[in-house]
Amino acid sequence: MIAGKRAAGFAAALCLLLALLCAVPAHAADDDDRFQGKTWDEVVEVFLSEHGIDPEKVALGYRNTVTGEEHFLNGDIYHMAASMQKVPLNMVYTERVRSGEMTLNERIDGYPYAKALELTIVNSDNDLAYRLWMKLGGFREYRSMIVPYMTDDPDSLDPIFFRDNYFTARQMIHCLNLLQTESERFPGLIDMMRLAEPKNYFNYHEQSYEIAHKYGYLKVLTTQYINDCAIVYTDEPIVIVMFTLSLPKPYDALADYCTLMADYAQYHTELRRAEEAQVTPSPSPSPSPAPTAAPTPTPAPTPTASPAPVLERDAEALPVVAAVAAAAAILLLACAAVFFRGRRHR
């Protein structure tokens, strides 16, 4: 009677352990339904719809600086850049510092250039920015100097590029990508962008990743241009830009776009890493050298199936499986000990 009860308890424990093992998830993290099975265009379409934004009122750009994945909405339409122009403007000067053509102490309008860099990027000083491009020979000369930073195809530039302060989203992404991937050419510029506007524009909401950015703001009568461009330090840094034209809630839109693009980048980075990290089957053992004496025939070994490749995402779940399996083994041993002890005492 007692032995029967012990056997029933033993069976119940086995069932419980099997249920625990089956409950272990196949993946350590759930897929994000914002991105799963969606293209970048579809992700952005949902974003614009949720924010009530007319697609004609914005221009967007995105690039992963590691993989080169790149996307645009209205990428080749010229928009008022406002103070975002101070990024390529200072690229001219910082590259001159790097080459030895000038120093950080060279004075511009009474300021050493190091201070002028800070004031134009962190404080967005328009008067000083004007003096910087006038020192280069005037507006048109300055615009000609920044062409290599903005495009690989100078012939594609619209005449408005040289007449006024207009850029496209594609040009700004090209500029930021160059700044990030060849940052040693432009000493100090990204450091100043990291300090700019810690609570506004792309930073209007707290972000999960550090950003280095430069906003652009201009209001003409009832028309309002509020823009931002940034390097976002996700696992694989991305560069993004958003131009807006008289949006009702521009700061929310900017911050939410920044968050969305960072999350999009992380999602696809992790997905790609999982796909690339497949565990390959163990290599076949090297054949043993032939024996010198005639060997006694031995039966051929029974072939075993090679292990199936396992994705990194499944590998991430292995610690959970191992923990449950260890607990299962301990519980099984305990149940077995109790069971057989009962049999001996019977």
Task: Tell me what each language-model feature is.
Residues 28-29, 72, 128-184:
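Mid-domain, small-residue-enriched loop/turn segments at the edges of structured enzyme/sensor domains
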Residues 29-57, 70, 78, 164, ...:
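Structured C-terminal helix/loop/strand segments within mature extracytoplasmic catalytic/sensor domains
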Residues 95-114, 185-189, 309-313:
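Short, well-structured active-site flanking segments
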Residues 102-123, 143-154:
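Active-site helix/loop module of the DD-peptidase/beta-lactamase fold
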Residues 11-22:
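Bacterial N-terminal signal peptides
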